[in-house]
């Protein structure tokens, strides 16, 4: 297969912002970056993160997860300057049940689904639908037997909304694996229209 052919098959994410993480999950050396598709340039927008995860960009606002300090932060994104301005925490870190990981917007964009990665010795996992305006938890999902919820994906079909959750098993101690038999499973939650 030619190089040009492979490139033609690649799908690009329209979100021009991505984050990095410290592999040891201990030091705030990660950052949020902007990728300019036209110039193919990358520039740092905001540093000092430990594990930049879920993102949602809409109408000049960016919601970003930094997992280790347990923050879900809203920023004003100035695309002309390529700058981020922190505005507020969506919810206080102490209110979050575990480490926030992946995030996806719900239809309409007024709330997001947040998946929580729990490294503790617990059996079940949690994900929440959080209203962006005030941090209120609208829906809580319990994923039985799988404490490390990583990535939600929201699908709309025939007027109904479904949420898919991926979960992790990598690095899970055997004693936790014994009480979490569904770790690594994909879960589906159907929501009413």
Each language-model region and where it sits:
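Beta-rich, blade/repeat-based domains predominating
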Residues: 1-14, 26-31, 42-62, 93-115, ...
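Short, conserved, GDST-rich strand-edge loop motifs in beta-rich repeat architectures
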Residues: 3-27, 114-121, 168-183
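A short loop-to-beta-strand structural motif that recurs across blades of beta-propeller domains
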Residues: 30-33, 71-73, 126-128, 182-187
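Predominantly a core beta-strand signature of beta-propeller blades
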Residues: 40-43, 86-89, 136-140
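Glycine- and Gly-Pro-enriched alpha-helical subdomains that act as flexible
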Residues: 56-79, 83-87
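Short loop/turn segments immediately following beta-strands, especially the blade-tip
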Residues: 75-83, 130-132, 190-193
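Short, loop-centered acidic/histidine patches that primarily coordinate divalent metals
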Residues: 108, 115-119, 130-133, 140-146, ...
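Blade-level signature of beta-propeller repeat domains, shared across WD40, Kelch, NHL, RCC1
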Residues: 151-193
